[in-house]
From Swiss-Prot:
Subunit structure: Homodimer. The RNAP catalytic core consists of 2 alpha, 1 beta, 1 beta' and 1 omega subunit. When a sigma factor is associated with the core the holoenzyme is formed, which can initiate transcription.
Keyword field: DNA-directed RNA polymerase, Nucleotidyltransferase, Transcription, Transferase
Organism in which the protein naturally occurs: Hahella chejuensis (strain KCTC 2396)
GO biological process, one term: DNA-templated transcription
Protein name in UniProt: DNA-directed RNA polymerase subunit alpha
Catalytic activity: RNA(n) + a ribonucleoside 5'-triphosphate = RNA(n+1) + diphosphate
Residue ranges of the region described as Alpha C-terminal domain (alpha-CTD): 248-334
Function: DNA-dependent RNA polymerase catalyzes the transcription of DNA into RNA using the four ribonucleoside triphosphates as substrates.
EC number: 2.7.7.6
The organism's place on the tree of life at top rank: Bacteria
């Protein structure tokens, strides 16, 4: 089959070999020669460094002031406990932060399943051992969980100021990425008479908070979003203009008829294309007195009616007319 020189092959087959719930191999073929390494390297970097996820960022343990302490009745020292908590696989559904509690006493292991969870927080590895207690062991701790991306050292976290943070709040270097391991391999592929094509095989393992197939899909979406700007160089990278919310008092949007003026005064205002109360209050006394057939008696009536509603003549409105009446031909004619 003859192909144009400008026409690139696109993958026809995506095969997912699910080894277990957290481990899968994804095969993509065929690819033009060289594209296996191009896409494989880019996806691998994103999967390892840029995937969003959740992790423990702060820990409070009763009776512990710093990470070099020990806890009576606990076999592990505090540093070991913190290292174990870094391996906690947490998933939050509808928020960016949560504070969880753990209270355990008596001999035996303290597991991730012993953590008291909120309704929208899950732990994917409930059998993970946090520490081990002796017969007189008693441990109480609070865990602050946050959502983030990639790897974040504790000293770069802006949420905790060293001077104001309470003593005993231990900060953790956090790896938010749900991807534990990823590798790729490029093999040969064939389509009809072409034998110089690539087949990309991605071997991926996650912590259980996301399945491997979804992880690759998210990584590909991130890559697509980053490359989209190169598609159209002429597109202006100006920030989108966000229209300020127009805060207009509802009374100003009401017609002048609602003021229940005399017929003479109402007709004079309409003759000057003054249809809304917002139009009226922006006129001055001098301007209204220039209106044909509108005398001082009518002017006094208008001022009194406006005053009863907390309004007056000569007021200035920044966003008038608002969008809701901007298309009104009567307003445009004023």
């Amino acid at each position: 089959m003859q192909r144009s020189l400008n026409e690139f092959l696109t993958p026809r087959t995506i095969e997912v070999n699910q080894i277990n719930a957290t481990h899968a191999k994804v095969t993509l073929e065929p690819l033009e020669r060289g594209f296996g390494h191009t896409l494989g390297s880019a996806l691998r970097r994103i999967l390892l460094s840029s995937m969003p996820g959740c992790a423990v960022v702060e820990v409070e343990i009763d009776g512990v002031l710093h990470e070099y302490s020990t806890v009576e009745g606990v076999q592990e020292d505090v540093i070991e406990i913190l290292l174990n908590l870094k391996n906690l696989a947490i998933k939050m559904h509808n928020r960016d932060e949560a504070t969880l509690s753990l209270n355990k006493k008596g001999a035996g292991p303290v597991l991730a399943s012993d953590i008291q969870l909120d309704h929208d927080v899950e732990i994917a590895n409930p059998d993970m051992v946090i520490c081990n207690l002796n017969s007189n062991g008693d441990v109480k701790m609070k865990l602050k969980v946050a959502r983030g991306r990639g790897y974040e050292p504790a000293d770069q976290r802006n949420s905790a100021d060293d001077e104001t943070r309470a003593i005993g709040r231990l900060q953790l270097d956090s790896s938010f990425s749900p991807v534990l391991r990823v590798a790729y391999n490029v093999e040969s592929a064939r389509v009809e008479q072409r034998t110089d094509l690539d087949k990309l095989v991605i071997d991926l393992e996650t912590n259980g908070t996301i399945d491997p197939e979804e992880a690759i899909r998210r990584a590909a979406t991130i890559l697509q979003q980053q490359l989209a700007v190169f598609v159209d160089f002429d597109q202006q990278n100006e920030p989108e203009k966000v229209e300020e919310q127009e805060e207009i008092d509802p009374i100003l949007l009401r017609p002048v008829d609602d003021l229940e003026l005399t017929v003479r005064s109402a007709n004079c205002l309409k003759a000057e294309n003054i249809y809304y109360i917002g139009d009226l209050i922006q006129r001055t006394e001098v301007e209204l007195l220039k209106t044909p057939n509108l005398g001082k008696k009518s002017l006094t009536e208008i001022k009194d009616v406006l005053a009863s509603r907390g309004l007056s003549l000569g007021m200035r409105l920044e966003n008038w007319p608002p969008a809701s009446i901007r298309g009104d031909d009567r307003v445009l004619g004023g």
